[in-house]
Amino acid sequence: MTKDFSRGWFNMPGRPGDRELADQMKGLGWLFANCKGKSILDAGCAEGLISIELAKAGALAVHGVELVPERVKLANKLRGDLPITVEVGDMNMWRPQRHYSIVIGLAILHKLRSPTTVAAALAAKALDAVVWRLPPDGAPVIKDRRSGYEEHDIGIVMETSGFRLHEAVSGHLGEWVGVYVRK
């Protein structure tokens, strides 16, 4: 099955998408209350709309990584002179070369071949916190066809990576949003 990337992730004027920005902001209260002056990695940033909102809320710098080149091009156009960089990268293979205050992965881990491997690699580069948005069924455990229906316990990954669950809230459509802070 091939994904149709002609549609955007975010619904925008003149470009249909699958999600509304306002819906995708649900459950991100902690992130926005704590982003000021922080560096942020947005893994799987789509068109960069949440990255843009983080920069507007005072993030020092936001680095986005997205698989779809058209989305990266649009994100770089939309960001203007905000402190945001966006690059093309496949989160199955891409690894951060530096540390960030906060790492976010919003609706990305369950789409990967090895969510636990990627979660551990990203957590290793987070100085203060990691925010995950996961499907509602069984979170923080992921079981998805894209990872061969194996169970991937993101909670255990975060615990062994030196984080504790600070809060878990519901996002749009009951998605699980977990905020992990460094112990």
Residue ranges and their predicted role:
Residues 127-139:
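Conserved beta-strand signature within the Rossmann-like core of class I S-adenosyl-L-methionine
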Residues 162-170:
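Short secondary-structure junctions
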Residues 180-183:
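Active-site beta-strand termini and strand-to-loop segments that position acidic
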Residues 38, 101, 128:
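Conserved acidic residues
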Residues 1-97, 106, 117, 169, ...:
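Conserved N-terminal segment of class I S-adenosyl-L-methionine
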Residues 122-126:
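Short, conserved loop/helix-junction motifs that constitute active-site signature segments
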Residues 102-114:
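A short SAM/SAH-binding and catalytic strip from SAM-dependent methyltransferases
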Residues 146-161:
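Short alpha-helix
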